[in-house]
């Protein structure tokens, strides 16, 4: 009942891409690969026997991990002894075409990943496998192997006996009063004040008649790092909403986004500049 499997990620050498850019390649050589990047996976696989694992976006020394039989089969299964199924990261298979440029075709990117040992894919690169088998471009044995690995784990978890678990048991844990209180405590304690120059915080409202709130995150509910999927949720209070609620009519609040998260467009900047110039204080909410 209610059984799940953990999924270690991202295999492998994901944490130090060139220039700190997500997806960029990692350089290091064989010694660093084995002594540094493979070590945590080797230990976790040996000590906990995880039934699932996720690939990474990166290439190591120019070889895209997700499309490499050397990394995904020879090392992961042959050397480390991994027995579960491999799951792609979002878009990691498609990026064999769009980012790593090792093939001009999405279907071919899918074939490379499947043959390398990636059993389950998030994006659309596996959608045409039936046609590819019929055309002789893909050996069905790779599909059979992937399906066998996935179904084996599902049987081990008992998903065919109780596919939905016990909703009543889940409701006692998920969003229970105890867990909601704990989540709030964690969120409160996660806030980090890097610097409080001139002791500006907490704000002395007697000094400010107007405050500008600018930035792409100024009116978004971001509940954590990499939590972009919750940015438009109606549950929760945004920075702008919270300030307006607390300040009421005591302080004039001017708002402007100024820019988008990922864009080089400058059409919103003037509005933000105007809001800041007309205010006694600016609060800027940026970052992704």
Predicted region positions:
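Glycoside hydrolase catalytic-domain context in secreted enzymes
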Residues: 1-288
């Amino acid at each position: 009942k209610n059984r799940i499997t953990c999924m270690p990620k991202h295999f492998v050498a994901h944490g130090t891409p060139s220039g700190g850019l997500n997806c960029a390649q990692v350089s290091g050589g064989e010694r660093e690969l084995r002594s540094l990047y493979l070590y945590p996976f080797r230990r976790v696989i040996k000590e906990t026997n995880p039934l699932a694992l996720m690939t990474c976006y990166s290439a190591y020394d120019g070889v895209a991990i997700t499309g490499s039989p050397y990394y995904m089969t020879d090392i992961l299964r042959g050397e480390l002894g991994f027995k579960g199924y491999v799951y792609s990261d979002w878009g990691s298979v498609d990026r064999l075409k769009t980012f790593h440029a090792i093939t001009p075709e999405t279907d071919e990117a899918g074939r490379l990943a499947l043959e390398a040992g990636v059993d389950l894919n998030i994006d659309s690169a596996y959608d045409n496998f039936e046609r590819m088998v019929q055309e002789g471009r893909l050996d069905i044995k790779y599909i059979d192997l992937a399906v066998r690995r996935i179904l084996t784990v599902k049987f081990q978890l008992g998903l065919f006996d109780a596919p939905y678990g016990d909703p009543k048991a889940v409701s006692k844990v998920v969003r229970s009063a105890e867990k909601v209180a704990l989540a709030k405590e964690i969120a409160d304690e996660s806030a980090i004040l890097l610097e409080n120059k001139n002791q500006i915080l907490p704000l002395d409202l007697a000094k400010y008649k107007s405050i500008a709130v600018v930035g792409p995150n100024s009116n978004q509910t971001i509940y954590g790092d990499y939590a972009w999927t919750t940015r438009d949720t109606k549950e929760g209070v945004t920075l702008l909403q919270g300030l307006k609620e607390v300040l009421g009519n005591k302080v004039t609040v001017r708002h402007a986004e100024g820019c988008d998260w990922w864009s080089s467009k400058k059409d919103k900047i003037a509005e933000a500049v105007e809001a800041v110039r007309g205010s006694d204080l600016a609060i800027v909410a940026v970052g992704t």
